[in-house]
Amino acid sequence: FPWLLRDPTDLGFLDHYQRVLANSEYTRSWVRRLWGVEAEVLFPPIRVQDLPRGPKQRRILTVGRFIARGVGHSKKQLELVEAFGHMIRRGGMDGWELHVVGGCEPSMRPYLAEVERAAEGLPVHVHANAPRPLVEELFATSSIFWVATGLGEDEEKAPWLFEHFGITTVEAMAAGCVPVVIDKAGQREIVRHGTDGYRWTTLDELEALSRRLAGDDELRGRLAAAAVERAGAFSEEAFVARWRQIAARLGLR
């Protein structure tokens, strides 16, 4: 809705829609608050069956576009690299690596360079504009998946800076990664804390939960299996079933 950038108070476009669909409860809540209309939740369809699962290695993975804080929807890669560096310096993470994957537009190259400088001297691998086969290989072989979108942001002032849903989280779970994600926005609707992953509110919690997983193969394996099962709730089949329910309730064909 680019016209909302010109005049956020002009909601006349809503008169041209019979129904509004939201991609999460988080989005629905803000549609209600900002637009004053009710929406139906329809989670995006994800091809979970296509995500490969291979022998897991001591890898932590984070995936998202490189966007500097204050510019847009930042995935907070810099903060995650710094947190991982802190974990490495404290010890007890022998053999573990962090892989940072994401697209990078020319305007964001200074931010990418900042992330790369923070990674120097650490077992951190930065993959800018990685091809899809490499991304899938990292999904398949990584053990833990990190998300920090929204860290340090104010939801009341800028709700768009948070994950409205979290497609890459579901993809990682389908590939058998244990998600350790920020306890904000759409991530809350995907990851059930202590059941199929963990949610955190501070970087100290992120480090503690990740360290617990890194040191406990049995726990990591159990949560990984639960994560794969949970990802099925967001499959294409689940999407079709949910859409049919919505269509029937609304009298649509």
Feature annotation, model-predicted:
Residues 1-20, 27-29:
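Membrane-proximal helix-turn-helix segments that form the acceptor-binding/catalytic region
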Residues 33-37, 46-50, 55-118:
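Conserved catalytic-core segment of nucleotide-activated headgroup transferases in glycan assembly
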